[in-house]
Each structure stands twice: as C-alpha cells, then as structure tokens.
C-alpha cells in the first residue's frame, strides 16, 4: 500500500499536471481528482509495495492430467511507457509434476499480482510463467495473452480495437510440439 507521504506526492503531481494542461484543479469537478488518482494508483500498482505472492495452496494428486488449462482470464495493467491501461485475457496451461496441482482460483490471483504494476505485455507474459514455475515447478508452462492497449488506441497511431498477442512456453510445451499444438487448438475454441 502507498504510504501517506507518497499519497501526498501523487496528489501534488496530479494537481501540477491539471494546471499544466490548462485546468483549474480547484474547480468543483476536479477538486477531489488528485486524491482519487492517488487512491487509484495505490490499487493498480499494489504489487510494487506488496510482499512476494504467497496466496496459494498446492494439492497432491496421485494421477495428474497431462495438461491443466485455464482460459479467458480477464486482466488489466498499466503501460509503463504512458501510464495508460492495457487489458485483455490470459490463457494459462501447465503440465503437473511431483503429483501436485495448484488451487484453480490461485492462477487468476497470480495474474492480478503480476499485472498490478507498471508493465509491458511481453514482461507480464513471462512474469506469470516465472511465478507459476517458482510456486509449482511443473513439467511445462504455456501462457498466452491477448490485449488492447490504450496507448495505441487513444494516442499516437490511434488505432482502436487492435489486439496484441504474446506467448511464452517452457518445458514440455517447448519440446513437445503435439502438446503445444493441443494448447493452441484448445485456446482457439
């Protein structure tokens, strides 16, 4: 959580930005905006002040499946270049080993943890896989992200609706082309 000193710094900076773009930060519609933005940053950048992700439980499974797949997990993050949102869906698959699996709800929580900081999509993709590898040590991981970036839609090239895709594969997903193909076919449905 952002402490009071840094909260005040953010509020001051937002007032300065509003003034610099020709707004009156004391007018009725904007007077509370600096505090709102500071609270919003505390929320969307929560990982920067959080402890390492440890909100998970592993379960022993005598006969684990070949692949565990979670599809269409929504996420949002903030582009580190423009501090504008990017958002979309994540597909995560892993091949269990050591007869253990992770609680299913923990993967979306892990995605939230990795995305709540200034980011680029490519690093977010790898971060999700790296954290899952650290926690679970599976035989392979596949992560695919499809996202829309407001820094491309609202400014610069101004192309609404463009989707950016990124992926990361490790272990069996990298060496077993049939497994990788199965992952890609299943996420395409």
From Swiss-Prot:
One of its GO terms (biological process) is tetrahydrobiopterin biosynthetic process. It is an enzyme of class 3 (hydrolase). One of its GO terms (cellular component) is cytoplasm. Pathway: Cofactor biosynthesis; 7,8-dihydroneopterin triphosphate biosynthesis; 7,8-dihydroneopterin triphosphate from GTP: step 1/1. It catalyses: GTP + H2O = 7,8-dihydroneopterin 3'-triphosphate + formate + H(+). It holds the Pfam family GTP_cyclohydroI. Transmembrane segments: none annotated. InterPro entries: GTP-CH-I_C/QueF, GTP-CH-I_N, GTP_CycHdrlase_I, GTP_CycHdrlase_I_CS, GTP_CycHdrlase_I_dom. GO terms for molecular function: GTP binding; GTP cyclohydrolase I activity; zinc ion binding. Its EC number is 3.5.4.16. Toroid-shaped homodecamer, composed of two pentamers of five dimers. Keywords: GTP-binding, Hydrolase, Metal-binding, Nucleotide-binding, One-carbon metabolism, Zinc. Belongs to the GTP cyclohydrolase I family. SUPFAM superfamilies: Tetrahydrobiopterin biosynthesis enzymes-like. This is GTP cyclohydrolase 1. Zn(2+) binds at residues 79, 82, 151. The lineage of its organism: Bacteria, Bacillati, Bacillota, Bacilli, Lactobacillales.
């Amino acid at each position: 959580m952002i402490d009071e000193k840094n909260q005040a710094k953010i509020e001051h900076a937002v007032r300065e930005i509003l003034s610099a773009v020709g707004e009156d930060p004391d007018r009725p519609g904007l007077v509370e905006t600096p505090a709102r933005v500071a609270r919003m940053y505390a929320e969307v950048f929560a990982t920067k002040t959080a402890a390492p992700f440890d909100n998970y439980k592993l379960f022993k499974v005598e006969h684990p499946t070949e692949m565990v797949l979670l599809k269409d997990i929504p996420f949002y993050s903030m582009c580190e270049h423009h501090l504008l949102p990017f958002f979309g869906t994540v597909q995560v698959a892993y091949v269990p080993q050591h007869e253990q699996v992770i609680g299913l709800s923990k993967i979306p929580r892990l995605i939230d943890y990795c995305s709540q900081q200034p980011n680029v999509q490519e690093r977010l993709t790898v971060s999700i896989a790296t954290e899952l590898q650290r926690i679970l040590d599976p035989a392979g991981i596949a992560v695919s992200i499809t996202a829309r970036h407001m820094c491309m839609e609202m400014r610069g090239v101004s192309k609404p609706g463009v989707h950016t895709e990124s992926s990361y594969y490790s272990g069996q997903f990298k060496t077993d082309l049939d497994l990788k193909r199965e992952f890609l076919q299943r996420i395409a449905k």
